[in-house]
Every structure is written in structure tokens, then in C-alpha cells.
Amino acid sequence: MITLNDLRIIQTKVNLLPYKSDAENFGTPEFWARISELGSGDCDDYELEKYHRLILIGMKPSQLRLATCFVEEHRDSEGQWVPKKDRYHLVLLVDLNGITYVLDNRYPHPMEWELLPYEWHKLQIPGTQTWEWAANADRSFGE
């Protein structure tokens, strides 16, 4: 049985891998691959790696879904507000014992999704490659 500690271990190990934007890695704004295949990566690469590792330890695809969101407003290193389009982010949602946890490369530990100040955009339908708008999404995982 998968535990919260298993999520923490995978979150910690994957988050230790180096961050590098797709523009730096590939000269393109977006390229999705597991971070272990690249040696470094951005948010989608981290979360694909976590998804893969969770499947390897026995988690069902129906318990996992990728989600896009806009993260909280913040200032850049020069003190300027980061525009909304540049706050677009991808995380992994994990259903564990009826609680939805967010695995996010910006945080060291899994977080309950209700605690994050994100504006949810699209959610993957669990176990599929289909996405739905968050406003219309079934927030439960169901089997």
C-alpha cells in the first residue's frame, strides 16, 4: 500500500534534480519529457517523472492526474510583478486515502490541494490523456 511517506520520498528525490527551462534545454518554449531522461527540466518534466515513479511503486493511473494552474502572484528578482501568463504551472495531483495531494517542484513536501492559492486551469481525467477545464472538472478521482 502506498503511503504519504512514499509520496514524500518521491517528491524529495525528484525535486533534487536540477531545474532548467525548456528554452535553455531545447531552445523551444515547451517540451515534455521525464526529467530523468533529460538530466534537468522544468515543472512538467518533474511531474512526469513523479507520475512514472509512482506507477512503478504500484499506484494506479486512476489515482493520478496532471493539472495546470496559475500560481500565486509574486514579484521577480527585480521587484516587478510577474504577469499572469508567466505564472502558468503544471503539478501532479495524487489521490491517497480520499485526500488529494499536490506534488509541486516548488515545494519540498506534498500539499493538500485545498491549501494552495492556485487558480486551477485544466485537469487531466485520471487514467486518460484527456483534459477538462477545471471549472467543469469532476474534482473527485473515483474508480
Which positions does each model-derived feature cover?
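A structural boundary/capping signal
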Residues: 1-143
